[in-house]
């Protein structure tokens, strides 16, 4: 499964909030809800997050094998 834990950690380190994602990143509240629920998002969203935080994809998502 894909985990967004690295995103929340990156946001915490940089003092960002979900409001930051919406206003500066153009990420919708429904997309934020999907990420919080561990659901899939588009590659365009992942790209927008990488641009917003000037980071690598590994700072946004990670793969965790199903148990």
Model-assigned labels for residue ranges:
Residues 54-67:
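Short C-terminal boundary/hinge segments that cap the last helix of small helical domains
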Residues 12, 23, 51:
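Alpha-helical residues within the helix-turn-helix
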Residues 15-33:
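Short alpha-helical DNA-recognition segment
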Residues 10, 24, 35, 63:
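Residues in the recognition helix of alpha-helical DNA-binding motifs
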Residues 38-51:
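Short, basic-rich loop-to-helix N-cap that marks the start of a DNA-contacting helix
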């Amino acid at each position: 499964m894909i985990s967004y834990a690295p995103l929340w950690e990156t946001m915490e380190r940089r003092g960002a909030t979900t409001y930051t994602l919406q206003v500066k990143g153009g990420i919708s509240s429904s997309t934020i809800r999907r990420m919080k629920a561990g659901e899939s998002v588009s590659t365009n969203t992942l790209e927008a997050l990488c641009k917003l935080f000037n980071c690598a994809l590994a700072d946004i998502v990670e793969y965790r094998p199903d148990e």
